[in-house]
From Swiss-Prot:
<keyword id="KW-0479">Metal-binding</keyword>
<comment type="similarity">
    <text>Belongs to the shikimate kinase family.</text>
</comment>
<feature type="binding site">
    <location>
        <position position="59"/>
    </location>
    <ligand>
        <name>substrate</name>
    </ligand>
</feature>
<keyword id="KW-0547">Nucleotide-binding</keyword>
<keyword id="KW-0057">Aromatic amino acid biosynthesis</keyword>
<comment type="subunit">
    <text>Monomer.</text>
</comment>
<keyword id="KW-0460">Magnesium</keyword>
<dbReference type="GO" id="GO:0004765">
    <property type="term" value="F:shikimate kinase activity"/>
</dbReference>
<keyword id="KW-0963">Cytoplasm</keyword>
<feature type="binding site">
    <location>
        <position position="81"/>
    </location>
    <ligand>
        <name>substrate</name>
    </ligand>
</feature>
<feature type="binding site">
    <location>
        <position position="35"/>
    </location>
    <ligand>
        <name>substrate</name>
    </ligand>
</feature>
<dbReference type="Pfam" id="PF01202">
    <property type="entry name" value="SKI"/>
</dbReference>
<feature type="binding site">
    <location>
        <position position="17"/>
    </location>
    <ligand>
        <name>Mg(2+)</name>
    </ligand>
</feature>
<keyword id="KW-0028">Amino-acid biosynthesis</keyword>
<feature type="binding site">
    <location>
        <position position="138"/>
    </location>
    <ligand>
        <name>substrate</name>
    </ligand>
</feature>
<protein>
    <recommendedName>
        <fullName>Shikimate kinase</fullName>
        <ecNumber>2.7.1.71</ecNumber>
    </recommendedName>
</protein>
<feature type="binding site">
    <location>
        <begin position="13"/>
        <end position="18"/>
    </location>
    <ligand>
        <name>ATP</name>
    </ligand>
</feature>
């Protein structure tokens, strides 16, 4: 049994919510998505929060939610793509669980997010270029906070989740060896 919280970080479209839900189901943990928690508590969507409060207002809400959620036990938490921008979030995540960075190349992120209108940072003339810029800015922060880095791509959710679990099980009874990098090979049958 995995007796620690699992926190997923990575860019928008990397699969944090989808993989997080699956991980929670197969580990018996409770699943939380920090963005959905913010929407649930405010009663409005992330784009509306960005429109009214700007990104800085949203980030303040995000810090409060993450500080609260990391206090829970037996959870899988999918964070927002920009959660790592705040040093306090990185500190809280590192101290309260195992952090898994789900990495995907920008073109893959673009394919996954291109039809999603709920991403205010991609409301630009060139969303692919914006994704590249965001990843360039945030990748060092994801890597700083990560205990494990899993490169995703076109792999099925089950294959990625199973690789995350395989890596996490190595930590049973002890602290992880930080910065393991794993590339999950595509497995069509998984």
């Amino acid at each position: 049994m995995l007796n620690f919280n699992i926190f997923l970080v990575g860019p928008m479209g990397s699969g944090k919510t989808t993989i997080g839900r699956y991980l929670a189901r197969i580990t018996g943990k409770n699943f939380y998505d920090s963005d959905r928690e913010i929407e649930s508590r405010t009663g409005v969507s992330i784009p509306v929060i960005f429109e009214i409060e700007g990104e800085s207002g949203f980030r303040q809400r995000e810090c409060k939610i993450i500080a609260e959620l990391v206090q829970l036990n037996n959870i899988v938490l999918a964070t927002g793509g920009g959660a790592v921008l705040a040093a306090e979030n990185r500190r809280e995540l590192s101290q309260r669980g195992i952090v898994v960075y789900l990495y995907a190349p920008p073109k893959q992120l673009y394919r996954r997010t291109s039809h999603d209108n709920n991403r205010p940072l991609l409301r630009t003339g060139n969303p692919l270029e914006r994704l590249k810029c965001l990843l360039k800015e945030r990748d060092p922060l994801y890597r700083e906070v990560a205990d494990v880095i899993i490169k995703t791509g076109k792999q099925p959710v089950k294959a990625v989740a199973n690789e995350v679990l395989r890596q996490l099980r190595q930590y049973k009874g002890g602290a992880p060896q930080r910065k393991s990098f794993v590339h999950v090979k595509s497995n069509k049958g998984a």
